[in-house]
């Protein structure tokens, strides 16, 4: 069973709809027992880094998710969910993240021709292979974000060019992140979710 983690973070309905389209058994839950028994976890998210971590802490889910990852359960963070995977965020204030991947989440600097938030379709550039990256080179996916994860190159699988090289997919061990919205990225996005689910079997 894939568990989509419930912490009032926005795009859960779209993620569940995409998984249903793939015929995947999934459930929205904040139940610690279900989370640590899951075959895989998806941490979605739309909103601000500090508020998200505060809500996860309030529900007692930070320790639970860390326990699940330590057990080897695959975790996919989407959009804000990916940003929460790193050590800290600098949105509004400095806030501790999960720390699964070293690095920080910081604001994209607006430049001529590159407004913030970064919103719309961008082509992916695969930097290194992971279980989720097959067939992604040059494919377009949908982004909506103002912050990005600044992490070491060894954890960056896929990037997009947005005045700077923005990490679009990161991973370390059983922890994966997608800065874009696979659930809003058509067949390409569904393919990424399918690869993640296959990884969890």
From Swiss-Prot:
It catalyses: 5-[(5-phospho-1-deoxy-D-ribulos-1-ylimino)methylamino]-1-(5-phospho-beta-D-ribosyl)imidazole-4-carboxamide + L-glutamine = D-erythro-1-(imidazol-4-yl)glycerol 3-phosphate + 5-amino-1-(5-phospho-beta-D-ribosyl)imidazole-4-carboxamide + L-glutamate + H(+); L-glutamine + H2O = L-glutamate + NH4(+). One of its GO terms (molecular function) is imidazoleglycerol-phosphate synthase activity. Keywords: Amino-acid biosynthesis, Cytoplasm, Glutamine amidotransferase, Histidine biosynthesis, Hydrolase, Lyase. Coiled coil: none annotated. It holds the Pfam family GATase. The active site is at residues 79, 181, 183. One of its GO terms (cellular component) is cytoplasm. Pathway: Amino-acid biosynthesis; L-histidine biosynthesis; L-histidine from 5-phospho-alpha-D-ribose 1-diphosphate: step 5/9. Residues 1-201 form the Glutamine amidotransferase type-1 domain. GO terms for biological process: L-histidine biosynthetic process. CDD domains: GATase1_IGP_Synthase. Its EC number is 4.3.2.10, 3.5.1.2. InterPro entries: Class_I_gatase-like (IPR029062), GATASE (IPR017926), Imidazole-glycPsynth_HisH (IPR010139). SUPFAM superfamilies: Class I glutamine amidotransferase-like. It is found in: Cytoplasm. Its main location: cytoplasm. IGPS catalyzes the conversion of PRFAR and glutamine to IGP, AICAR and glutamate. The HisH subunit catalyzes the hydrolysis of glutamine to glutamate and ammonia as part of the synthesis of IGP and AICAR. The resulting ammonia molecule is channeled to the active site of HisF. Heterodimer of HisH and HisF. This is Imidazole glycerol phosphate synthase subunit HisH. It comes from Streptococcus mutans serotype c (strain ATCC 700610 / UA159). The lineage of its organism: Bacteria, Bacillati, Bacillota, Bacilli, Lactobacillales. The gene is hisH.
